[in-house]
Amino acid sequence: MDRTCEERPAEDGSDEEDPDSMEAPTRIRDTPEDIVLEAPASGLAFHPARDLLAAGDVDGDVFVFSYSCQEGETKELWSSGHHLKACRAVAFSEDGQKLVTVSKDKAIHVLDVEQGRLERRISKAHGAPINSLLLVDENVLATGDDMGGIRLWDQRKEGPLMDMRQHEEYIADMALDPAKKLLLTASGDGCLGVFNIKRRRFELLSEPQSGDLTSVTLMKCGKKVACGSSEGTIYLFNWNGFGATSDRFALRAESIDCMVPVTESLLCTGSTDGVIRAVNILPNRVVGSVGQHTGEPVGELALSHCGRFLASSGHDQRLKFWDMAQLRAVVVDDYRQRKKKGGPLRALSSKTWSTDDFFAGLREEGEDSMAQEEKEETGDDSD
């Protein structure tokens, strides 16, 4: 296992060294150091087994970094500038040997992870800029574009396996069920889409919700589907009940721009206000704040292969790492204790709030809409 994902070793001062040749001890941090890019990242992904992080930026460049809690050991391994416009999404293959990227230039690229060599390019893969990417298995991938188009690709073949256009707006995000049968899509038209990729057919669209659906993920062991929205609301659907929502949970956030599951009940959201919120699903609670990009929107979130680190990208051109240990230890009780109004949002890591951070006055989420939330939760907390 990589050192970063192990417990940090205890310092051993038993070894004697020549004072004249002693070097300053290596500092071990709680999280890797921030990575500073030349442009904001618009795609982010962790390697499935190694301590590597890939990022694609709005200039079309793709980077792969090795990260470590040892100070000075987080480094760029390589970069690629093959895309002509913004790189919108990046994803590692299941075996970790390939990196797939998609771009506003309508192209799909497959890169070798070790050297960054471009192995395959599918030019004009869509008629519109590509916005989202999901790898189904080692050979098959799905892409969604700005006009609502969905395409399924087999890297061993020429041309798409499936080409659908049921949505009226851009495809913001996609998710897959464990059986790799149903592809779920979140769209700017406010609808959740369901596509059977085994039979290569369209199944249904949900009722449109208020605002764009910006993200989608499975929760509660696949029994629930959660969608984030541009209105700052999380919409919940029952599995096999995709036509209409079963519940909704409004955060006090301008929007939910990205979302990543941490456990079967906990997820993290990134918002325009720069705050990364930890949210429990059923019972619906904002648990606290994992971190923030001060005054800058959070565009992407990703969870490391060991689950220890959350990475975030903001318009401040920084990639930040957050320790998930404290969040994973949180226990959310079904009973809601009425908190004092005006209390601060609970910090879930040592570096959540900086001393000069104007977000330090951020108030507890949802207190003035408590009654509405409790009403919405009633009768739906059980699966």
Curated annotation (Swiss-Prot):
Phosphoserine modifications at: 14, 354, 382
GO biological process, one term: rRNA processing
A Pfam family matched in the record: WDR55
Cellular compartment(s): Nucleus, Nucleolus; Cytoplasm
Biased composition annotated in UniProt, kind: Acidic residues: 12-21, 365-383
GO CC annotation terms, alphabetical: cytoplasm; nucleolus
Gene3D superfamilies for this protein: YVTN repeat-like/Quinoprotein amine dehydrogenase
Region (Disordered): 1-33, 362-383
Keyword hit for Phosphoprotein: yes
Domain of life: Eukaryota
Family, similarity comment: Belongs to the WD repeat WDR55 family.
Protein name (record): WD repeat-containing protein 55
